[in-house]
Amino acid sequence: MLAGARLQRRRRQLQQPQQPRWRQPLPWPMNADPPPPPWVWMVPGTAGLLRLGAGVAPPPVLLASAQPASAPLLPRLPGWPAPGEPLLPLLPLSSAPDHAAVHHYPLLHGQWLFGGHSPSIGLAPSSAVELVPLFPHVCPSTLSPPVGKNWIDKRMPNYKIFFNNPFALDSTWMYPEESVLFHSHEKTHFLANQVTPSLSRPTPASRPLPTVVLAAQPIPGGCHDSLKPISRGPTITITAATAAAAATAMVSVDPEELRGLSPSIMQPCHFLTLTPIRIPFRTAPFSDKGKEHSRAPRSPALMLRAPERKSLVGDKEDKEPPPILVRGEETAAKGNKPVASTPVPGSPWCVVWTGDDRVFFFNPTMQLSVWEKPVDLQNRGDLKRIIEDPPHKRKLEASATESSDGSSSDDGSEDQSVKTKRNRTESCEGPGPEDTHQVDKGPQTPPPQILLPLEERVTHFRDMLLERGVSAFSTWEKELHKIVFDPRYLLLNSEERKQIFEQFVKTRIKEEYKERKSKLLLAKEEFKKLLEESKVSPRTTFKEFAEKHGRDQRFRLVQKRKDQEHFFNQFILILKKRDKENRLRLRKMR
């Protein structure tokens, strides 16, 4: 019984006329990738401006009159040199965005701005806002998006259409034949007389809005399929009046009755020629500099530039002398210059003192100067002693002691010094008439410095290398920090310094090798004495010995760890041999 009732119910449902099922269109969130065509774009029944968020731009549009919701797809247009995807007319909406259908299919990231025939809408200029004019019953084409942001020319018989990535903010300027730029106060005159105004520049603004002219063009006879010729279409004008204080956008629609239309056939369409003149929004200076070089050559450009501001004190600025480049050494204070340096033993760092008794650390291998103590020198106990004992103060103290010794000399020497001082003051009392005449002529040049002969300078430089302990086994760059602050360093130029350094290294390397060998022998003897005094047994290890006697000065004389272990192992072998010999003797005695 239940099965029969179900079958009867199913037959009744099949006999009833079924209503056509319409696929509910899905809204496209504009922050996501676009779906595959065809697209349906819901717009209200009145004209207005749509303000979109950054990066959102509609596809190319086709202006059409009212059509029913169930209108079929338009077939491919003959003579259209583009892929043959069809055009899908949009569903007409009755009124403004208050309608329920608009809320049902919202345009995300958009805000509708509407008004009467000539509303004044105040908009704050912003680089993240795009203004798109929308008109009732607009059909987006499913043509492939244009490459680049260049204008693509789509032609039909006796007709021309410009498509672009609409209102994409860019710093390029396209100049089609229909481009017109005018002020907002010229709009009324333009609409009344239908005369194209002359090109004029708007008043400069910090961030102007784009100025766009949209004009509907009639399609002459010879259109195909459902496209019919139209005598005149409505003229739509959008202008942007720029000013320093604020910017406003004007939209006006001048409707006229369309003539020559037949109600029996499909409602005619007419195309819209889009000719924007875009003023770029610059968020930062020189932001588009890199793009200009990478762009290919384009059609003639229209450049709008604000007039340069002339300063009121321009004459004074012209009279001012040009700036003079001065070396950092001349501008730096004398107290900031380095006075002396001392290398820290066992590390690549050296301590440098300045004239104002400040201390910084310099690494010549890395060419690095640091005011704070480096990590390598954090646990050095001798660093404080080095900082507290600067070498330049030692010299001052030594000179002060010498002067004090000289002051305790006999009275005769004091009388002689007084006489010499008197003679100096008498000779320097005042210049004679000839001297005053020379002084009046101009500033005297300082007397030329007498240079020592080259041989003496070379000997002084060699003495400096010996005194500073420059190693013959090192390089010029590593040893530079030892000699760069010595006044004798400046006796030679850079080429002569390096030549003498190379000669010094060649002659010095043999002597230094002998010195190193003798030092190593002395250190070895001292190390053996330490081993003998420590009473090491053959079973003790080097680690135990180093922990116990590592702070001894004789242990530190041998600097390399390998040498220390080698000497220790040699001593242990000698001890083992002695033990064996002693055991053999004891066995023989038994």
Curated annotation (Swiss-Prot):
Q: Which GO terms describe its molecular function?
A: RNA polymerase binding
Biased composition (Low complexity) is annotated at: 14-25
Taxonomically, which superkingdom? Eukaryota
Matches recorded under InterPro entries: FF_domain (IPR002713), FF_domain_sf (IPR036517), TCRG1-like (IPR045148), WW_dom (IPR001202), WW_dom_sf (IPR036020)
Alphabetized UniProt keyword annotations? Repeat
Q: Offer one Pfam family short name for this entry.
A: WW_TCERG1
Where is the secretion signal located?
Answer: none
Segments carrying the region annotation (Disordered) are 1-29, 285-344, 382-450
- Coiled-coil stretches are none
Which positions fall inside the WW domain?
145-178, 343-376
Ranges of Basic and acidic residues composition bias in the record: 306-332, 382-391
- For the keyword Transcription regulation, the answer is no
Identify the residues that the record assigns to the FF domain, covering every copy: 454-507, 519-574
Question: What's the protein here called?
Answer: Transcription elongation regulator 1-like protein
Organism the protein comes from: Mus musculus (Mouse)
